[in-house]
From Swiss-Prot:
This is Homeobox protein orthopedia. It comes from Drosophila melanogaster (Fruit fly). May be involved in the development of the central nervous system. It holds the Pfam family Homeodomain. GO terms for molecular function: DNA binding; DNA-binding transcription factor activity, RNA polymerase II-specific. First appears at gastrulation in the ectodermal proctodeum and later in the hindgut, anal plate, and along the CNS.
Length: 409
């Protein structure tokens, strides 16, 4: 009853047949999948009747089931479906094989990196030193000699030429003088130093000049030699400068700066304070005399005579005698007195040169009395006020040094 209710309510099931009907169905199926009509139906009816004792199934229902089940449970359809699935699987396998073949071809097309041996590199470098652009015959010869292909040799030469051009460009930039510097630049060291410092009218030639310093020549010695030739300084200043430079080279830069440059700076600043005195081609002072020559003449002689001598004595290690200091002071006051007696007649440069050695050789005896007079001291103070401060320090330093040396000896 339950089977009949299920069959009537739910409808026929696929392949819901007894075992005997299934065996008869499989045995009686022809090549086209059609069921025979005659005896098979009787057998099916008998089989269905045998089961009908517990509730038989009419023959028509069995036929309908067979018809539906025959269309659904056909072996040929199952076989065809199986063949179709296998065909799809074969297609997938073929596609996979094709992809593998393509990947192998790509790997074959990809070039392997060539590793050159040292012997091959030496041969290639030797050929590159001969020519940078070898022809096809030379490349083939090189390839046969080192065991490479002509294309590899050609590529190596291309890379080597590119490297050579890049290296040449960088080396040219660093080797070219002034390539990395601005175009205008700065003037060379020592060019026209005296013209810049003291003016073109004071001294015509440069201290160091524009030429390069040669090997083995002291540049400071050469510069001071040119300056001494072109300046109107005395021979004592010349010897003082040379001895100062020699002692500086022997004792060090500190003593050289203390002696040589101080003497040079003091004497030049005295010369510059005179004004109007300029260097001619022969090294003698010109004949032009400024209107304030009377006030400057009493200041000019001490640096030209006293200071170089004192600096020379200091360089030689000898203390300056006391009578020389007295002679210098008396000479100064004597000149002051002469200028007071003759204010309207300024001496010419030749007369000044003649008066200088006479006053040094024969100092007057009465000058010691005027040294202590109040008027002379006032004039001395006014003169010292007229002299710049950096020039006033030089005589005091010399007197302090002489006093110390006298106390030692």
């Amino acid at each position: 009853m339950l089977n009949n209710l299920g069959a009537n309510v739910l409808g026929p099931k696929d392949c819901d047949l007894p075992k005997a009907a299934l065996t008869a169905l499989h045995a009686g199926v022809n090549s086209f999948g059609q069921l025979p009509v005659g005896p098979n139906l009787a057998d099916l009816g008998g089989g269905a009747g045998g089961g009908g004792s517990s509730g038989g199934v009419p023959v028509g229902g069995g036929v309908a089931r067979l018809h539906i089940s025959g269309g659904l449970c056909d072996n040929s359809n199952a076989l065809n479906g199986g063949n179709g699935s296998s065909g799809n699987g074969n297609g997938n396998n073929n596609n996979g094989n094709g992809n593998n073949n393509n990947s192998m071809q790509q790997q074959d097309q990809k070039r392997h990196r060539t590793r050159f041996t040292p012997a091959q590199l030496n041969e290639l470098e030797r050929c590159f030193s001969k020519t940078h652009y070898p022809d096809i015959f030379m490349r083939e010869e090189i390839a046969m000699r080192i065991g490479l292909t002509e294309s590899r040799v050609q590529v190596w030469f291309q890379n080597r030429r590119a490297k050579w051009k890049k290296r040449k460009k960088t080396t040219n930039v660093f080797r070219t003088p002034g390539a990395l510097l601005p175009s205008h630049g700065l003037p060379p060291f020592g060019a026209n130093i005296t013209n810049i410092a003291m003016g073109d009218g004071l001294c015509g030639t440069g201290m160091f000049g524009g030429d390069r310093w040669s090997v083995g020549v002291n540049p400071m010695t050469a510069g001071f030699g040119q300056l001494n030739q072109s300046s109107p300084l005395s021979s004592s200043l010349n010897s003082g400068l040379n001895s100062g430079i020699n002692m500086g080279s022997a004792l060090g830069a500190g003593s050289y700066q203390h002696y040589g440059l101080n003497a040079l700076g003091d004497s030049m600043m005295y010369q510059h304070s005179v004004g109007g005195v300029s260097c001619g081609p022969s090294g003698s002072p010109s004949a032009t005399t400024p209107p304030n020559m009377n006030s400057c003449s009493s200041v000019t002689p001490p640096p030209l005579s006293a200071q170089p001598n004192s600096s020379q004595n200091e360089l030689n290690g000898e203390p300056m005698p006391l009578h020389q200091q007295q002679q210098q002071q008396t000479h100064q006051h004597q000149q002051q007195q002469t200028h007071q007696h003759h204010p309207m007649a300024p001496p010419t440069p030749t007369q000044q040169q003649q008066q200088l050695p006479q006053s040094m050789q024969s100092p007057s005896d009465g000058a010691n009395d005027t040294l202590h007079s109040i008027a002379a001291l006032r004039r001395r103070a006014s003169e010292l006020n007229a002299i710049p401060s950096y020039l006033q320090m030089a005589p005091h330093n010399y007197e302090h040094y002489n006093s110390n040396s006298n106390s030692v000896y």
